[in-house]
């Protein structure tokens, strides 16, 4: 495994808002891992489901924020998660020369096709657009299931892995932590391709006033084929799922199945056998 030879400059963002518990959990884990200096540019209010939406022809206010944990600098942004990353990389922290963007920790999973809607993942994709490696972190079900004691070493190992450039182009990682049954520990990590399942939502009718109809979106089920995808199966089997977020579009894909399987083998050989993770799983 490639080891870091410098202290990183890390920008954090999310889609649950700067005051969210998931952000606090992430900051705590990174402070304990002690791998870099932390800068925050996060929405001042919840921005879930914004994907890569940006505020065009709209004024976006960024306000200094006194974050309650010891970070280098923090800003609350009146915009989307993607707005936060654009401002962070191009304006607020431009002089810092950031090495990494981490988005999360989202309250609820972002796996399979639902990842397309995620503001958490949208922020990570924006970092890739700007040429910066990124990670999107999500906790299945609720942030209260996040295993804080194991997080520092897991995040450190994943950051080292990501910065070793294991893919043929600039790549992010979509990382989802399972809800462990009965409070048991996570059993391991797997590198998996993104799944095809779709957690669909149905517009719920709330009523009408003066001919105006009001609806709210609610997740009402999941479409699963005959066999669960590797990504979904990974979560169901109490393993942390790690799937790539590629920075390039291609009509034929960036990797063959055989090439991806080789990358999976290297993930197991390098990351899961490292001193950082053998004492966890």
Swiss-Prot record:
Cofactor: a divalent metal cation
Pfam families, per database record: SurE
InterPro entries, A to Z: SurE, SurE-like_Pase/nucleotidase, SurE-like_sf
Key words of the record: Cytoplasm, Hydrolase, Metal-binding, Nucleotide-binding
Binding annotation for a divalent metal cation: 15-16, 48, 106
Enzyme class: hydrolase
Annotated catalysed reactions: a ribonucleoside 5'-phosphate + H2O = a ribonucleoside + phosphate
Cystine pairs: none
Main location: cytoplasm
Hydrolase found in the keyword field: yes
EC number(s) per entry: 3.1.3.5
Cofactor note: Binds 1 divalent metal cation per subunit.
Localization annotation: Cytoplasm
GO CC, one annotated term: cytoplasm
GO terms of molecular function: 3'-nucleotidase activity; 5'-nucleotidase activity; exopolyphosphatase activity; metal ion binding; nucleotide binding
Family listed: Belongs to the SurE nucleotidase family.
NCBIfam families, per database record: PRK00346.2-3 (NF001493), surE (TIGR00087)
Function: Nucleotidase that shows phosphatase activity on nucleoside 5'-monophosphates.
PANTHER family named in the record: 5'-NUCLEOTIDASE SURE, 5'_3'-NUCLEOTIDASE SURE
Protein name: 5'-nucleotidase SurE
Organism from which the protein derives: Chlamydia pneumoniae
Gene this chain is encoded by: surE
């Amino acid at each position: 495994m490639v080891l870091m030879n410098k202290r990183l400059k890390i920008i954090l963002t999310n889609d649950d808002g700067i005051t969210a518990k998931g952000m606090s959990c992430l900051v705590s884990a990174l402070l304990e891992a002690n791998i870099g200096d932390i800068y925050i540019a996060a929405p001042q209010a919840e921005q879930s489901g914004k994907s890569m939406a940006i505020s065009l022809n709209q004024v976006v206010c960024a306000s200094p924020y006194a974050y309650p944990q010891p970070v280098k600098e923090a800003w609350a942004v009146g915009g989307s998660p993607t707005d936060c990353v654009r401002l962070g990389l191009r304006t607020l922290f431009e002089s810092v020369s950031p090495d990494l963007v981490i988005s999360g920790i989202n309250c609820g999973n972002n796996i399979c096709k639902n990842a397309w809607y995620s503001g958490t993942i949208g922020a990570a994709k924006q970092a890739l657009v700007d040429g910066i490696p990124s990670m999107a972190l999500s906790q299945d079900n609720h942030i209260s299931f996040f295993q804080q004691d194991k997080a520092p070493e897991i995040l450190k190992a994943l950051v080292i892995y990501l910065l070793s450039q294991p893919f043929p182009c600039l790549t992010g990682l979509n990382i989802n932590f399972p809800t462990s049954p009965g409070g048991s520990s996570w059993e391991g990590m797997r590198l998996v391709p993104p799944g095809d399942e779709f957690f669909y939502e149905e517009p719920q009718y709330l009523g009408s006033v003066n001919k105006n109809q009001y609806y709210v979106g609610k997740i009402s089920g999941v479409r699963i084929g005959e066999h669960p995808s590797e990504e979904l199966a990974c979560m169901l089997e109490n393993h942390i799922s790690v799937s790539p977020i590629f920075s390039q579009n291609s009509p034929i894909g960036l990797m063959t199945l055989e090439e991806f399987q080789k990358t999976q083998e290297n993930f197991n050989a390098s990351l899961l056998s490292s001193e950082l993770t053998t004492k966890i799983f």
